[in-house]
Design a protein with these regions (language model features):
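Extracytoplasmic/secreted envelope proteins and their assembly/folding machinery
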Residues: 24, 28, 104-107, 111, ...
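Primary recognition of N-terminal secretory signal peptides and signal-anchoring hydrophobic helices
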Residues: 1-78
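Active-site-adjacent mobile loop/cap segments within catalytic or ligand-binding domains
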Residues: 159, 166, 204-260
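Solvent-exposed coil/turn segments that connect beta secondary-structure elements
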Residues: 8, 49-51, 83-85, 126-127, ...
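Catalytic-core regions of hydrolytic enzymes
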Residues: 60-188, 196
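Proline/glycine-rich low-complexity loops and linkers
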Residues: 190-203
Length: 260
């Protein structure tokens, strides 16, 4: 296993073990460092300058000139809401992976992809922080996210989350809407694309009364990408490859929704 701190490789190659990963994550978080384990390359990335999850630039897949120059989403304003953040950790996986880190990493990758295709992207948060204020009441925090989307007059709103359940075998992808026909159509586009892209179980498109999709004034969905409580899906959510696939899949769902 490699350990890379602030872009520099540490001259040791310890054997991968669950205990070592948990220890590294515990140390990093106690010092407010960002940490990410790439399962495919057996590499731990640590960012000592920020608590944000590191996304190594050299790991980013090169976009083709056509993708980089595309304007097919020009004129579209898309609000992306990385679930949780700051004092709100969200759910925690079996090995200590934190939901707020996963959602932010996926959202940032999605933002980059959307902007390369001409969209104007509004992020409710771009770092590991509370959107309103630390330890605010839930409705105040969620209301701040809704206000950002409504204030930007966004065309669509997408809130990104990880699912969790007490039974670790629970698995799959679900996309929620609040019943508006266009929200249902957006949910179907994203759900189909995510299931195909990640190869997860299709848990379907469902109605829910979540605050952020109930009070937004545009087509809105809340996406549960996969179960962080499921050991296998936790690995996908925490990996660079899994996060890219999730971001790319949501992007393709958005493209299908706008029919561009």
């Amino acid at each position: 296993m490699q350990i890379i701190i602030d872009g520099h490789k540490v001259p040791i190659n310890p054997r991968v073990s669950k205990d070592l990963l948990i220890t590294l994550k515990s140390i990093a978080r106690s010092l407010h460092w960002g940490i990410l384990y790439d399962t495919n390359r057996e590499t731990v990335y640590i960012n000592t300058k920020s608590a944000s999850v590191p996304v190594p630039p050299h790991e980013r897949p090169a976009s083709s000139p056509a993708e980089a120059e595309s304007n097919r989403l020009a004129g579209k304003t898309i609000c992306i809401d990385p679930g949780h953040g700051g004092s709100d950790l969200g759910a925690i996986g079996p090995t200590g992976t934190i939901e707020k880190d996963n959602t932010l990493a996926i959202a940032l990758l999605l933002c980059d992809k959307l902007e390369k295709n001409g969209a104007t992207v509004i992020m409710t948060r771009e770092t590991d922080r509370d959107v309103s204020m630390p330890d605010a009441e839930t409705e105040v925090e969620l209301g701040a996210r809704v206000d950002i989307a409504n204030g930007a007059d966004a065309d669509i709103f997408i809130s990104i989350h990880n699912d969790s359940f007490t039974n670790p075998t629970a698995a799959g992808t679900t996309t929620f809407h609040y019943g508006h026909p266009e929200s249902i159509r957006l949910a179907n586009c994203i759900q189909k694309s995510l299931v195909e892209g990640l190869g997860t179980r299709d848990r379907g498109v469902r109605f829910a009364s979540f605050f952020v999709i109930r009070y937004t004034k545009m087509p809105a969905v809340l996406v549960e990408v996969a179960f962080i409580s499921n050991p296998e899906e936790e690995v996908v959510l925490a990996s660079i490859d899994g996060r890219y696939k999730a971001a790319e899949s949501i992007f393709q769902g958005i493209v299908k929704y706008f029919k561009v």
